[in-house]
Amino acid sequence: MAQSLSEAGISTFLVPDSSIYAIMSRVSKVILGAHAIIANGGMFAVTGSLLAATAAQAHSTPVVVCAGQFKITPLWNLYQDHSALDFSDPSSVLGFEEGTLVDKVDVINPYYDYVRPDLVHAYITNE
């Protein structure tokens, strides 16, 4: 999304998760994508979205979500094969070359965050 926005002439930059709160005071708007938008106004998005939305709320920065209309759903089942409980490959967080450390920790790498409806200011869809 950042590349598309940048190509359209919109000033865009990507920030590592660890720096989101520190940079938020200089941000005018947070734009997120969504995996699914549920009936209560909340959404599921890639991990890090909740952190960005929470930091934005603390700095009174609006959060805008861009998603196709097909991602709006009245129901959401957390216990299906593909759900908000999906996990990414643990090696993307902690490489297996870390030998002794890998044997001593369990790495849980969730793929989605649930972003509460009170953290989102507007949804933009294709219709």
Task: Give the ranges of each region predicted by the language model.
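Conserved phosphate- and dinucleotide-binding cores of soluble alpha/beta proteins
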Residues: 1-127
